[in-house]
């Protein structure tokens, strides 16, 4: 590791390998490359100082270099301790962009790196956040509340909160008043994922959101593509790389049937598994049933299934009492953002055997064992390399457009949570059609008049559900 320079990566010598993969990824990310072509000359993000907290993968490297091409200064960390691709981080660091990300970093390092992405070498402040899961945003807002005298740091609810609060206290001591200054300097945040969006809506509901936010997750070209088609490819990839298990014929349980659950169930079904689904929502449960999946309660299948995957964004979905009853060598993993969907903390007093990085065998007193992937964190990124470049291009193009919106239009957005307008959603989709050889049908003037829309779109009302 290098501590002298303004980056922390596992091995800077991996930069050449990372650059080769970045070059390949660019050919699969037409949305981002179109943004460079459209906005590269005008540089709408000139003056933007973006703090980025998002999985430091090859695809994210293409996003980072797109933001730079559009004029932004950037400091970056991963939003997950296992999701960094070390060669990607090295390539970005070698290009002169400060990045603080190491695959397998500790939680203490994770929160130190989150602090570092706000610490500009000239002592300046970030004016934009690009977030995934909301940790960077939460770090600043919690610190500012502590500076205001609120008692928000005295009762940590987990080991991670203990470490987070310690890092906030460290910064409070080193730089009194810094959190409030940093909060007030922010023009806005764009948020990538369901979990982070929930946090933002909760803040807005309580009147605690101090700047505008764009909910990238609920752009159609994110949630219906990244969440669904991305998981459809990357879930099984992660399980295979971790375990080499034959999935055909196995019984797999997917907890949750939202967009991520739909993609995950399709992924396992495509690999030949017999898939069952658990759900709390009657609409999603009906969708699962009509898609051909048996909808069950976890308690009814916990002792007979072979693979368990959580996709919900909720906590305590798979609990210690469930895992205790699982068959020997059942595989347990999560593809939701945080690690609390599975009660991993309750397993710590059992016998752990590390098989290889991010694959652990845990033995219960009665002798049955489970295989836990990525310690309950995102297995598609911890055990594999995440979603393919093409689908991430759609998500990240939304991020770029969101950053441009908030940075270039100060005052036009209130301190609320917004979704990008329909015409931009359609633009993102359009940018990805040529790569797939798609030819759109065009409306005639009479047809457009008949249904009351412009020939150029938007083609659907805001309330339309895709």
Swiss-Prot record:
Catalytic activity: S-adenosyl-L-homocysteine + H2O = L-homocysteine + adenosine
Segment forming the signal sequence: none
Amino-acid positions noted as binding substrate in the UniProt annotation, renumbered to this chain: 57, 132, 192, 222, 226
Cellular localisation: Cytoplasm
Binding site for NAD(+): 193-195, 227, 256-261, 279, 314, 335-337, 380
Broad class of enzyme this protein falls into: hydrolase
Alphabetically ordered keywords of this record: Cytoplasm, Hydrolase, NAD, One-carbon metabolism
Species classification: Bacteria, Pseudomonadati, Pseudomonadota, Alphaproteobacteria, Hyphomicrobiales
Function: May play a key role in the regulation of the intracellular concentration of adenosylhomocysteine.
The protein's Enzyme Commission number: 3.13.2.1
Record-stated family: Belongs to the adenosylhomocysteinase family.
Xref: SUPFAM superfamilies: Formate/glycerate dehydrogenase catalytic domain-like, NAD(P)-binding Rossmann-fold domains
Protein known as: Adenosylhomocysteinase
Top-level taxonomic group: Bacteria
């Amino acid at each position: 590791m290098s501590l002298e320079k303004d980056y922390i990566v596992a091995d800077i010598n991996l930069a050449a390998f990372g650059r080769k993969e970045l070059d390949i990824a660019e050919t699969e990310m037409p949305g981002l490359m179109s943004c460079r072509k459209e906005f590269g000359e005008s540089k709408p993000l000139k003056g933007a100082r973006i703090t980025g907290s998002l999985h430091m993968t090859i695809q994210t490297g293409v996003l980072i270099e797109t933001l730079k091409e559009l004029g932004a200064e950037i400091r970056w960390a991963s939003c997950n301790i296992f999701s960094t691709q070390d060669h990607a981080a090295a390539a970005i660091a070698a290009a002169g962009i400060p990045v603080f990300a190491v695959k397998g970093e500790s939680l203490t390092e994770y929160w130190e790196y989150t602090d570092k992405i706000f610490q500009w070498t000239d002592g300046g402040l970030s004016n934009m956040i690009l977030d995934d899961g909301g940790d960077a945003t939460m770090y600043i807002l919690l610190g500012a509340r502590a500076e205001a005298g609120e008692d928000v740091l005295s009762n940590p609810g987990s080991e991670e909160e203990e470490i987070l609060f310690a890092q906030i206290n460290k910064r409070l001591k080193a730089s009194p008043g810094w959190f409030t200054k940093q909060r007030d300097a922010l023009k806005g945040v764009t948020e990538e994922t369901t979990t982070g969006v929930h946090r933002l809506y909760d803040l807005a509901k309580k009147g605690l959101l101090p700047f505008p936010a764009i909910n990238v997750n609920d752009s159609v070209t994110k949630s219906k593509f990244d969440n669904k088609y991305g998981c459809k490819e990357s879930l099984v990839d992660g399980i295979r790389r971790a375990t080499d298990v034959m999935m055909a014929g196995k019984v797999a349980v997917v907890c949750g049937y939202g967009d991520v659950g739909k993609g995950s169930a399709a992924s396992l079904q495509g690999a030949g598994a017999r898939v069952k689904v658990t759900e709390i929502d009657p609409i999603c449960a009906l969708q699962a049933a009509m898609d051909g999946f048996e909808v069950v309660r976890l308690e009814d299948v916990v002792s007979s299934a072979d693979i368990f995957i959580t996709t919900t964004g909720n906590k305590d979905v798979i609990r210690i009492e469930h895992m205790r009853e699982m068959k020997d060598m059942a595989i347990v993993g999560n593809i939701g953002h945080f690690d609390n969907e599975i009660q991993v903390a309750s397993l710590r007093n059992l016998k752990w055997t590390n098989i290889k990085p991010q694959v652990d065998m845990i033995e219960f007193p009665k002798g049955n064992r489970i295989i836990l992937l990525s310690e309950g964190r995102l297995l598609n990124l911890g055990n594999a390399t995440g979603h393919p470049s093409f689908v991430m291009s759609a998500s990240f193009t939304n991020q770029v457009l969101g950053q441009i919106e908030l940075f270039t239009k100060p005052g036009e957005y209130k301190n609320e949570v917004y979704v990008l307008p329909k015409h931009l959603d359609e633009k993102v989709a359009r940018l990805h059609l040529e790569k797939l050889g798609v030819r759109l049908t065009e409306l005639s003037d009479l047809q457009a008049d008949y249904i009351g829309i412009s020939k150029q779109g938007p083609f659907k009302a805001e309330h339309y559900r895709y």
